[in-house]
């Protein structure tokens, strides 16, 4: 990676979003997905480029934390949806981004609010070209106000 080193927690956040998406679409359990990421996705060399290292402990905490607290996390997200919208109406990737971000805001007070929101908005931008990143920014900001004020 040319000079622009990605932080291990940033890599862990992206991996957690991917893992949450994988669990939702495949029905796989959190422990098997964490194991798969550890064995096959972290510390890889792709086309001669070493992928940035992930904070694997942080990744596992995010994935397990979302699964353990998903009902409460989803309640916080649903409060941010337009009237008549259901969580299932959102794209599965957007749900994964929101769930991971909401988990950090609600349960990881050691991580600054601005860092959490910025990281997940950037992840959203890597998946979406439309208004989704703006929605995710607004939803996470509102969740942060509820959880941290």
From Swiss-Prot:
<keyword id="KW-0804">Transcription</keyword>
<dbReference type="InterPro" id="IPR011605">
    <property type="entry name" value="NusB_fam"/>
</dbReference>
<dbReference type="InterPro" id="IPR006027">
    <property type="entry name" value="NusB_RsmB_TIM44"/>
</dbReference>
<dbReference type="Pfam" id="PF01029">
    <property type="entry name" value="NusB"/>
</dbReference>
<comment type="similarity">
    <text>Belongs to the NusB family.</text>
</comment>
<keyword id="KW-0805">Transcription regulation</keyword>
<dbReference type="InterPro" id="IPR035926">
    <property type="entry name" value="NusB-like_sf"/>
</dbReference>
<dbReference type="GO" id="GO:0003723">
    <property type="term" value="F:RNA binding"/>
</dbReference>
<keyword id="KW-0889">Transcription antitermination</keyword>
<keyword id="KW-0694">RNA-binding</keyword>
<dbReference type="GO" id="GO:0031564">
    <property type="term" value="P:transcription antitermination"/>
</dbReference>
<comment type="function">
    <text>Involved in transcription antitermination. Required for transcription of ribosomal RNA (rRNA) genes. Binds specifically to the boxA antiterminator sequence of the ribosomal RNA (rrn) operons.</text>
</comment>
<dbReference type="GO" id="GO:0005829">
    <property type="term" value="C:cytosol"/>
</dbReference>
<protein>
    <recommendedName>
        <fullName>Transcription antitermination protein NusB</fullName>
    </recommendedName>
</protein>
<dbReference type="GO" id="GO:0006353">
    <property type="term" value="P:DNA-templated transcription termination"/>
</dbReference>
